[in-house]
Amino acid sequence: MKLSDLLRLGVCVAVLLVAGLALASPPEGGYHLLKKYELGAAPGGKEYWDYITFDASTRRLYISHNTEVKVVDADSGAILGSIPDLKRVHGIALVPDLGRGFISDGGADEAVVFDLKTLKVTGHIKTGGNPDCIFYEPASKHIFTMNGKSNDATVIDPATETVVATIPMGGRPEYAVADGKGMIYDNIEDKDEVVVLDSRTNTVKAHWPIAPSGGATAMEMDVKHRRLFIGGRNKVLAIMDADSGKVLQTFPIGDGVDTNIYEPETGLLFTATREGTLHIFHEDTPDKFSVVETVKTEFGARNMALDPRTHRLFIDTGDFAPPAAPTAEQPKPQPTPVSGTFRLLVYGR
């Protein structure tokens, strides 16, 4: 090989190495508040909110708000409509191919079906007690609800709107994720473990302890690298191998975690907590994560959704009144949301 060829080869190798390092580095610039949208009071005046679902195809946010689902334009913050007359909304799952959405109504022990175009309720499906997390699993083409009161999962055929199975979970199920190939991973909040389900057979395949994390609530997955991200109410984030159940790394986080979001394009992992902290981590390698920054948000801002196009985060919260004096029935009273202060916060770079 000629000297000139060697020099050209060396330059190419150097360029590739630099490019590789750039891909492995977290994006520059900190996350901060960009916009704030007021969303108004919940019907009946009692404030409660839970999961947010973002539909990238329509640029819509479906936001649980006590007895209704608010539908919001993700770009303008305008309220496009609502799905009212529910009991206590937790989550919203969308099945665009059928033109239907499914709401977990924990107060009614049912999944409520609605039309994605008209937002009109079209059906009610009985589930286990207090359905919380709800999601569409693509391999089986079924809807799953995780039922916190009856300690089981309800499996629904969204095409026929019928229950096809009920799966005992062995504890109180919280948030779950699917790998797209048939496996589901669910937090068992009161047992400090992850349950692995096979959606093709509707059977439990494994129970994995999550120590030193505990009180598992938030769950997310890096599907490509087979990593689970488990947020615990004992203020520990655990990173787990989705094939072996081994806990690979842990990080301290704020109090009251409820949502984890992983962004494959940037390798960023976001964790939102009730105390008003947004923790941001970076996947340096599948076996090594690092802290990027911790952003101060607002108290109660623990539920969020990600827009993968703009890389912006949508987080909801409201104002809170001080907790009442302790009583025998309520030895540890919590701050209570103030009616009419519900709002959507938009964070980005």
Where are these regions (language model features)?
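Bacterial N-terminal signal peptides that target proteins for export
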Residues: M1-V11
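Bacterial N-terminal signal peptides
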Residues: G10-G20
